[in-house]
Amino acid sequence: MGRFTLPRDLYHGTGSLETLKTLTGKKAIVVVGGGSMKRFGFLDKAVAYLKEAGMEVELFEGVEPDPSVETVMKGAEAMRKFQPDWIVAMGGGSPIDAAKAMWVFYEYPDTTFEEIITPFSFPTLRTKAKFCAIPSTSGTATEVTAFSVITDYHKGIKYPLADFNITPDVAIVDPELAETMPKKLVAHTGMDAMTHAIEAYVSTLH
């Protein structure tokens, strides 16, 4: 038997970032990457919308490309201190992937990274927070999938984490964000999309 899981709500269209105003909660942490979302003004907009929704907002910035286990643990620690009920991941695949893993260790601080390497072995999430993904690139599709890729640089291994629990609750796909991509990145993410299609065909995880 197969299973196909998508976010509960997917908002698409120019200006859909404003949907953040409709989220209900007390605190939101926004996870972002290298600075493009701040540079183009989208981070400030997101924070303003969340505050308009009545939430206290904190940022976790600087998630690197191919996020590391260390970054994930730092983010989870920041979440445990702040205690958000919304995790908002914004940017390319890396900050969204990292935030998914942070989510696990925020809700289950005693869990080890080794325990979640096995596909579909995660503990039940949403005991503390829900997840909203806002992609700024095309190609990774992490905003609508049950997957995350985290790198252990000490071992030199990229770990694909897989569990339906980490499928976002809400995905906001606003094309205004993707329009900021340079041509080279557009090409790279196109290859990413093609690679995902090939992976689905040759995967032994059935």
Could you say what each language-model-derived stretch is?
Residues 107-206:
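A glycine/threonine-rich phosphate-anchoring loop and its flanking beta-alpha core
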Residues 74-76, 95-108, 144-145:
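Short Gly/Thr/Asp-enriched flexible loops that form oxyanion-binding sites at enzyme active sites
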Residues 11-12, 58-61, 88, 98, ...:
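General beta-strand structural signal in soluble alpha/beta enzymes
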